[in-house]
């Protein structure tokens, strides 16, 4: 795809929310200028109309007194408010797909919940599909309909979120869930996954998780498992599903 072709779908068909809103926003421009620029470029509307639309979207993501605050600079907002601005900016051209990359990074628990509620409202009110990239299993459980578990840049397991949490079908997924602290169990130490994260420049020829897998088979190191589909679930593992511990 050429850069020109990609520009046609960027913002209009899909948009992205990045991890750090402070570095994603231009510190030298007012919020109104940054948001209006997107609409003027992709929709060809006047600056005054673009600013009005920016105010409407800031109000939609629950920024108080949006008409006044749209004239402020990024440093005048808290981290949570900056993330709301990024969400509003991503909605300017009403994309069909919104990719949120760790949208709650460096936010406290209360603000995290508020941001996730805003994303849930966006999904419902705007009819936008959301791909959430995160390491937070609690957020996955509370927000996602479907989950893809990845390791070493490859999909290990995929399926409805409730099913994956209740019955993991891959040793890596099982290890992740066991490492989550539980309030209903009195455990002296947390479970961990042995070994080190993968070196992406030197992945093994077989399963990328094989160097750390506690249930490794003879062919796991040499042969990459194919993704098999069973109902609404898919997984890539040589180990039979019933033997996953």
Model-found features: residue ranges?
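Short catalytic/signature loops enriched in Gly
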Residues: 64-68, 158-245
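ABC ATPase NBD coupling module
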Residues: 1-15, 33, 41, 163-168, ...
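ABC-type ATPase nucleotide-binding domains, specifically the catalytic core motifs of the NBD
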Residues: 1-6, 29-49, 59-63, 159
